[in-house]
Amino acid sequence: MLRRHQRFLAYGAAGWLFEVLFTGAKGPVRDGDWRLAGHTYLWMLPIYGSSAYLFEPAHNALRERPWWQRGTAYAAGFFAVEAASGAAIRRATGEIPWDYRRARGNRPVPANWRGLCRPLYAPVWFVAGLGLEHLHDRLSPPPTPPSPAATPRKRPETASDLA
């Protein structure tokens, strides 16, 4: 099992990798650009790495819920992190790398909230959260439930207990 700071780096690296793949795959679809040039930002390592501190406890708390409830909760959580981290970066630097208020080429400005979040990405975050469950379980296996032998037995009720 990896320590938390090691998992921080693993989530950060995985996030960078998937962002580069995602942005590279959008080129042909969005612009007809078949160079498949993906990119990310140094800012993203700590943002993705924060999954070790934010996503893991949420996943542990939601393990018994149906997949669609977990995915919805993860998407909402990712939107919250995207908005909070984007607002912090904007406050520190005056802009954010993924500002959704910018037009892309001759396309209109996409629906967004303050340039920080795009509702269109909800399915992406939904699926990403469910995918992160598998990464989390590989990096830090879930605790095993106690065996029945280790669970104290309840004393059977007697007539004197009921009186």
Description of each model-found segment:
Residues M1-A163:
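Aromatic-rich, lipid-facing transmembrane alpha helices and their immediate juxtamembrane interface loops
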